[in-house]
Amino acid sequence: MASDTEKLMCLTTENAEIPADFVELQPLDEIETVSLETNVSQTIEVYGDVGVDWAHGGHYHSPLIALQPLAGSNLSNGDHDQEMIIVQTREEVVDYQDSDNLLLGTEFESQMVLPVTEDDYLQPTTATFSGFMAAENGQDELSPYGGNLCGLTTIIEAGAEEGVNPDLGDKQWEQKQIQIDGLDGEFPFAMWEDNNLKEDPVAEEEAGESTPDYSEYMTGKKFPPEGIPGIDLSDPKQLAEFTSMKPKKPKGDFPRPVACSHKGCGKMFKDNSAMRKHLHIHGPRVHVCAECGKAFVESSKLKRHQLVHTGEKPYQCTFEGCGRRFSLDFNLRTHVRIHTGDKPFVCPFDACNKKFAQSTNLKSHILTHVKNKNDQ
């Protein structure tokens, strides 16, 4: 006779239409336990080439992706419908300029190039998938320089964390964090400084204060009879250096309480906005001309330079019967002096009263005085 437990059986049905009297129930003698193993997660390893050939012509090539299954033995509710994705990426992708052009010319002294060892060409790091997509989709929003300077700074910071010193030849760059006063309080500002330019600030300040302004000798003032202290006007080399000195810009009457935070600069500005705009000149030249390889700090300077290669001349002389066109507004202003007769550049030698419309013509003329003395 069967026990009570063998006779007692329960059947649970939902929305069943068949009466229980027509269902024959059979007891189960043994329940077989089956262990379930399935691949519930995957690891995606993205190996990004961090060498100089990881991009070409400004286009990013998709990295190699290797899939490796991971076996999971513990399943919770709903785990079989989910996948865990881990993206391993090397660094953020930024705009790229032809690396061959980065070594051309002498105007690349301020650029920063990261040396990469052979072991660093394929090296994985770990990042979340959502963070990777945010870096890719929000790149332009995060960069105040249109994705160029900010992206390059990100790469250099990554190299600095790994012990790599960003340098180009003898250039050694160091990042400096400064605090700038804003409307909402102080905020940090990252600035790159060339270690080779570090000198004694006191000596630089004294030298800056003692340097006279010789530009007045190019616009009408005559040389004194005793000459200029420290300059031999009879020496062609010293005279050529004298003519190549840049004139100092006249300072306005408004106060300039904000000083440039870059070591050794010392320039003063009327507000923080003007100072922050000036700070860009101390950074790397990331805007490179694809035609000749010249590099510029600001994209606007690069666009103006590219007019030389394209042959475009948007500036036209408005004087009747002339109509000459120029690629730069500066050249147009200089050309207009031919029509107006304006000759602001006067020979500084006492016995000479020649005047010129362009400073370059005056500089060439000044050297003739030394040549004539040597011929006598």
Swiss-Prot record:
Which GO cellular component term is one of those annotated?
PcG protein complex
**Locations listed in the record:** Nucleus
Keyword Coiled coil part of the UniProt annotation: no
Give the region (Mediates transcriptional activation) as residue ranges: 36-109
Keyword Signal assigned: no
Q: Name one GO molecular function term.
A: DNA-binding transcription factor activity, RNA polymerase II-specific
Q: What else is known?
A: The gene encoding this protein appears to have arisen by retrotransposition of the YY1 gene in placental mammals. It is encoded by a single exon found in an intron of the gene Mbtps2.
**Listed name of the protein:** Transcription factor YY2
Species whose genome carries this gene: Rattus rattus (Black rat)
Read off the lineage from the record. Eukaryota, Metazoa, Chordata, Craniata, Vertebrata
